[in-house]
Regions:
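Anionic, Ser/Thr-rich low-complexity intrinsically disordered regions
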Residues: 1, 16-19, 36-39, 66, ...
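Hydrophobic alpha-helical connector segments
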Residues: 53, 64-100, 147-150, 172
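Short alpha-helical scaffolding segments that buttress acidic/His motifs in well-ordered protein cores
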Residues: 88-89, 103, 107, 150-157
Length: 184
């Protein structure tokens, strides 16, 4: 039962991220998930419940992503950190493109549904906590503030790549330059 719910939520993220909020319907999710008609509505009785489920599911997936990224040894210099962050951003705008677009769509949804902000903020805080430790390890005088600046840059770079895709997308020079400026 839990696996079917996860299958529905994965499909809903794909629909939201690939086709936009207007296409996030029970029928579209059922079709994308390859499940019988009515399955999504059995788990989520209305659109608000589906969106709430999407936020929770997205946070779980992103938590696992950050655990994978931070599982190894902490970067020992700016170059290593730039490489790690670049890999993450390329993944977010490549294989995980729909999920990243869905995250932005859910953030926009929070302008109409402020109650979503707390959960979305928890996800951002988890990323900030991990990044802050890396930046502290590299000698940042204000690691939390520097991490917030880095995450804002990554959001902007991801948003640009999602909305105006460049075939030659190479975020590393910008990331490396930003980190050098912060950690200088």
């Amino acid at each position: 039962m839990a696996r079917r719910r996860e299958q529905v939520l994965d499909a809903a993220l794909e629909v939201l991220g690939s086709e936009g909020a207007r296409r996030l319907t029970y029928q579209a999710v059922d079709t994308a998930a390859g499940v019988p008609s009515g399955t999504t509505s059995n788990y989520f009785r209305n659109r608000a419940a589906l969106v709430d489920g999407l936020v929770d599911h997205l946070l779980t997936l992103e938590h696992h992503d950050w655990e994978r990224v931070t599982a190894g040894a902490a970067p020992t210099d700016v170059g290593e950190l730039a490489d790690e962050v670049t890999r993450f951003l390329r993944h977010a705008t490549g294989p995980a493109r729909a999920r990243t677009a869905a995250r932005f769509a859910l953030r926009l949804e929070s302008t109409a549904r402020p109650e979503l902000r707390a959960a979305l903020a928890r996800g951002r805080e988890a990323a900030t906590a991990r990044g802050t430790e890396w930046l502290r390890h590299l000698g940042s005088a204000t690691p939390r503030r520097h991490c917030e600046i880095l995450l804002d840059h990554l959001d902007g770079a991801a948003f640009r790549q999602l909305t105006f895709p460049a075939d030659d997308f190479d975020p590393r020079p910008g990331i490396h330059g930003l980190l050098n400026g912060l950690l200088g």
